[in-house]
From Swiss-Prot:
Keywords: Antibiotic resistance, FAD, Flavoprotein, NADP, Nucleotide-binding, Oxidoreductase. This is Flavin-dependent monooxygenase. PANTHER family: MONOOXYGENASE, OXIDOREDUCTASE-RELATED. The gene is tet(50). Inhibited by anhydrotetracycline. Its EC number is 1.14.13.-. Its cofactor is FAD. The keyword Oxidoreductase applies. FAD binds at residues 12-15, 34-36, 44-47, 105, 267, 289, 296-302. InterPro entries: FAD-bd (IPR002938), FAD/NAD-bd_sf (IPR036188), FAD_aromatic-hydroxylase (IPR051704). One of its GO terms (biological process) is response to antibiotic. Isolated from a grassland soil sample. Tetracycline antibiotics bind to the ribosomal acceptor site (A-site), preventing binding of the aminoacyl-tRNA to the A-site. The hydrophilic side of tetracycline makes many hydrogen-bonding interactions with oxygen atoms of the ribosome's phosphate backbone.
Amino acid sequence: MTKHIKILVIGVGVAGPAVAYWLKRFGFSPVLIEKSAAVRKGGQALDIRGIATHIAKEMGIYDQICNMRTQIKCGRYVDVKGNVLHEEQGETFGFRQDDEVEILRGDLVEILMKAIADIPCEFKQSVIKIEQNEDSVTVTYKDGRVENYDLVIAADGIHSATRGMVFSKNEYQLINLGSYVSAFTIPNYLGLDHMELLCESNHKLVTLQSDSQADKAMAGFMFRSKHVLEDIRDEQEQKHFLHASFQNFGWETQNILNRMPESDDFYFDAITQIKMKSWTKGRIALIGDAAYCPSPLSGQGNNLAFVGAYILAGELKKADGDYIQAFTRYNELLHPFVEANQQFGVWVSESFLLKDDEVSKEIAEARSNKILAMIKSVSNSINLPQYE
């Protein structure tokens, strides 16, 4: 019986709670752990697109997502002197169509966690050792506790500690696409009203948006650089690098950076893809960015997480808990979808951060039209199996 199959899910981002939801719905017994003290508030804006929209509706959370969406009404391109070059309707500016929705990462995770309120979840917990044999997986926690599970599913992000413990370095690749991304919340000092501003020039891009939280604004930075940080996880090194990279950029950039110390949700990372021939090893599976991050610029990581969660849990149900059969199908079914979205991620990375002094209306419209067409294609480039 599947209800006796105990599954540890590592990570409370999008993929972790999503796969826990489907595991419980399909009759398994998942438990969640998360190294942070609580669900992180705010964060980057994420899109629910294509097939992922259908999955959100099946989960009964789509209406809640719509109620908490960002509601950006207008997007404006500005030059480094602050002159408005042109503007677009909010959904077009964000490359969204039909019933696709944008929501802050923290709000989406909060919705997902409410949907799995009956599933045990332990915060401030992490794994320091994983051992497996033919019968089970033995997990040693940082507090010294040792537990046995039938399966482990790791959804602990692009810098997955689980991936490093379970897979050898020749079994995965971190492919740096040559750019960096940063985001953090600051006071809405410009008084933006459901608006996003974007300034792009000389391989760099700065955005500022404010939506339903009128007193706050989300700042975003993307830029190309060949410089490699000594420690990509060192926040002080990240902030120094960001300051140095944008010190002469113009527009509102210095005003935004001067407010960076006020932020409590600073995010910074290299724009990277994860590539693996197999996302499973024995009784352990990777999911979401830990397995197949398509790059933050693609806007597709959220959708890969939703689809991957549904298929992994569904194949375990279909195989009646036979993890070897289920994991094989998970790899087979999802790889073409992942490859299409990762190829799109590379293309987006190359089409943004232009060397031009400014992005003309013609360039922006041509790029927008191509992105809309490509997103619609890659977001729906899989036929979802039915498991119920």
